[in-house]
Amino acid sequence: MDKSIPIKAIPVACVRPDLVDDVTKNTSTIPTMVSPVLTNMPSATSPLLMVPPLRTIWPSNKEWYDGDAGPSSTGPIKREASDNTNDTAHNTFAPPPEMVIPLITIRPSDDSSNYSCDAGAGPSTGPVKRGRGRPKGSKNSTPTEPKKPKVYDPNSLKVTSRGNFDSEITEAETETGNQEIVDSVMMRFDAVRRRLCQINHPEDILTTASGNCTKMGVKTNTRRRIGAVPGIHVGDIFYYWGEMCLVGLHKSNYGGIDFFTAAESAVEGHAAMCVVTAGQYDGETEGLDTLIYSGQGGTDVYGNARDQEMKGGNLALEASVSKGNDVRVVRGVIHPHENNQKIYIYDGMYLVSKFWTVTGKSGFKEFRFKLVRKPNQPPAYAIWKTVENLRNHDLIDSRQGFILEDLSFGAELLRVPLVNEVDEDDKTIPEDFDYIPSQCHSGMMTHEFHFDRQSLGCQNCRHQPCMHQNCTCVQRNGDLLPYHNNILVCRKPLIYECGGSCPCPDHCPTRLVQTGLKLHLEVFKTRNCGWGLRSWDPIRAGTFICEFAGLRKTKEEVEEDDDYLFDTSKIYQRFRWNYEPELLLEDSWEQVSEFINLPTQVLISAKEKGNVGRFMNHSCSPNVFWQPIEYENRGDVYLLIGLFAMKHIPPMTELTYDYGVSCVERSEEDEVLLYKGKKTCLCGSVKCRGSFT
């Protein structure tokens, strides 16, 4: 945790002066990346928010299947024979997903003079009017007949025209983006994808999500360019080919070589812009800083082998040899835990040093191109190979700065190493605390939620996983499962998991946060903020990372110097993570609420007892958010705090979430918002507000 240093309040205008005029903006629409802050306690003003969304990515050809959603029920989309042997779009197969609709749709007033509490830092979408009768998802609802799942027309969710939809991305931002716009596009695409997974869309999910976003103007960096792409950083990862297309990293939907068209070449000159490796073609080899890339083509329309020709992408790569221009390289790798899932790693700028021809295994001519990585770039593919060796060869104790093999001492299913690469001679371990893998139940019972104990437990599931709408636990989640393949589908005011009275098995899809770590996490020493937490594994947006475990406290019990305190009453920066109904031709009132309004303040201290969650530091631009989880055990109801990935997170990236601030005030002189926290923030984000807690 960040070191505690008393500080003075910092005006918000010092951080983002452009935001001050937007305080009264209607937050029911989607900001590009800015929206007001939330808190439990009303205040006289409404603060601004400065939180980036998340990144998301996917592929766009016949093999566009969603690893989260499973294969299309209609089978692959046929396309014409390609000259491109480097078509690296991937297949991903998994069962179709489910998703969530909120039970508690408590939403703040549009009155900008009031703040509202946002547990995970989520925006309100305005009040939702409902007719009289039992609220949707009511705990005492007893359906008289089995519910039938809604059947969707595959064409009813496909956008044909933009209409009056405002993507809030200007023409200039569409052509040339920035970090904020790229994050927004990736987040919004993935939210649509998750929604399509939830309803088991019968056609290709990724193609539908991509097409809708493109037609509705949710895209950026459409101008083709040589060199760096604004808003995209070396080391960024993408789970789907088409994500790279939406944010302008790789514009070719099918080919592994992206190059200027004939018309563009007349202006820019013929050259290659980006290549994506597949790691599966003859003669293609990959070193940490070099790449031998196979040319494209080599088959006719019937799939028969033939000589590759010096045209298209091959001609562009040849031109880049003499031109000496930068070429972006994206490495396609197999997911470490899902053999049918690919991940794409942006590895930075390369130069095409030479090319030659060989006779391939088919007996026909093939081209080879050698690309060399430019120096002084952050490591990307090299980090992937390092953690791959750690996972596969168990080299923990031989690592630089190794201190302890397992900080949990066997309490977790996966070991939690402790390393200090900042000072290898310092073998000090974190201060004394008892490691607990999950929340201590004592004091965590949610007496505030008065459940009918006779209705607890999904008795009608009969020892089968909860997969149908007649399950009482599914009904509490709005008739849809909250997770799919261990991925959170929507943020909600509260998520209900199966508990002790439920006869469903331990592998039930609604039992996630209770079942412990599923990622290879490690605790490491940071340069400025003490101990931190990171993962060996790539993390997809929505992935459960860990629980924040500790002891439930009252205000009176909290110690002044407790740096390991989780507090739901803080003011959190808001961001939008759930999908926009308009991007799927749904009514705006169907928006799933992200506003969290717990009936009482929740304080959890991990100072004396805790798990890896206690080592997750604060950031004003976090990559993790928190979500309240409720479950029942032996007739009592308990509240847990789950920490989930906000966006795709590359391996060995520090995991951070927003700790919140104590209050936000408006200065009397110039109406500038002031964020007041007790500790100086050292997160280093461009949107750092200067303080926290």
UniProtKB/Swiss-Prot annotation:
Residues forming the Post-SET domain are: 677-693
Taxonomic superkingdom: Eukaryota
Q: Where in the cell is it found?
A: Nucleus; Chromosome, Centromere
Q: Which reaction does it catalyse?
A: N(6)-methyl-L-lysyl(9)-[histone H3] + S-adenosyl-L-methionine = N(6),N(6)-dimethyl-L-lysyl(9)-[histone H3] + S-adenosyl-L-homocysteine + H(+); L-lysyl(9)-[histone H3] + S-adenosyl-L-methionine = N(6)-methyl-L-lysyl(9)-[histone H3] + S-adenosyl-L-homocysteine + H(+)
Which residues hold S-adenosyl-L-methionine?
Answer: C529, G530, W531, D562, Y564, R614, N617, H618
Q: Where is the SET domain?
A: 519-660
Q: Where does Zn(2+) 4 bind?
A: C620, C681, C683, C688
Annotated region of DNA binding: 129-141
Q: What is known of its domains?
A: Although the SET domain contains the active site of enzymatic activity, both pre-SET and post-SET domains are required for methyltransferase activity.
The entry sums up its family as follows: Belongs to the class V-like SAM-binding methyltransferase superfamily. Histone-lysine methyltransferase family. Suvar3-9 subfamily.
Question: How is this protein named in the record?
Answer: Histone-lysine N-methyltransferase, H3 lysine-9 specific SUVH7
Please name the source species: Arabidopsis thaliana
Gene assigned in the entry: SUVH7
